[in-house]
Amino acid sequence: MTVLTDKVAVVTGAGSGIGEAIATLLHEEGAKVVLAGRNKEKLQNVANQLSQDSVKVVPTDVTNKEEVDELIKIAQQTFGGLDIVINSAGQMLSSKITDYQVDEWDSMIDVNIKGTLYTAQAALPTMLEQSSGHLINIASISGFEVTKSSTIYSATKAAVHTITQGLEKELAKTGVKVTSISPGMVDTAITAAYNPTDRKKLEPQDIAEAVLYALTQPKHVNVNEITVRPV
């Protein structure tokens, strides 16, 4: 028996990169996985590599509260429960204030901050009612370390840290766990577009392993935060 046998996990941003790696590893460890993201074709490609009776594709825009509510509802209806929710949907666009790309700022705020909040508010009522569950938010080292070209992105990821820290206090003694995972540079399509190729990077699988570590601690242990950097 694998460590997450029959656990029900929802993973946003599951069509590629970190989200895909997380969804795949959780499935390998026995979880029933709901794949969420905007691109149905990418989600289906991921699903096709997994066992069809334990995976569900639900196209979802995390900036749309109604769609996120429906995602959580479908997960429960399909697999009969809700144990794990991974907020891995994220966006990194032009982040210099002096570039004045307000539309891109709005988009990052919507995906990175509102998406995290919408998913939490949809999942937590069920988790609180059953006195169990684990919410994991994928943040970023950029939330701690701002550069001249990462101002807006860093601000959104700092918000994810703050949201997670606040939830940790709100959920104390409820049986519901919450974790923030902050990767350094990860080799994905997003980072390839914005960063030099000679910079050291993590692999998406590295972040998936950090998620699994947080999920497999004893019941009385909550891993509040994990930082993952390349060496």
UniProtKB/Swiss-Prot annotation:
Source taxon at top rank: Bacteria
Enzyme Commission (EC) number: 1.-.-.-
Record Pfam families: adh_short (PF00106)
Binding residue positions for substrate: S140
Keyword Oxidoreductase attached: yes
UniProt keyword list: Oxidoreductase
Binding-site residues, NADP(+): 10-34
GO molecular function: oxidoreductase activity
Active site feature: Y153
Similarity comment text for this entry: Belongs to the short-chain dehydrogenases/reductases (SDR) family.
Name recorded for this polypeptide: Uncharacterized oxidoreductase SAOUHSC_02778
Native organism: Staphylococcus aureus (strain NCTC 8325 / PS 47)
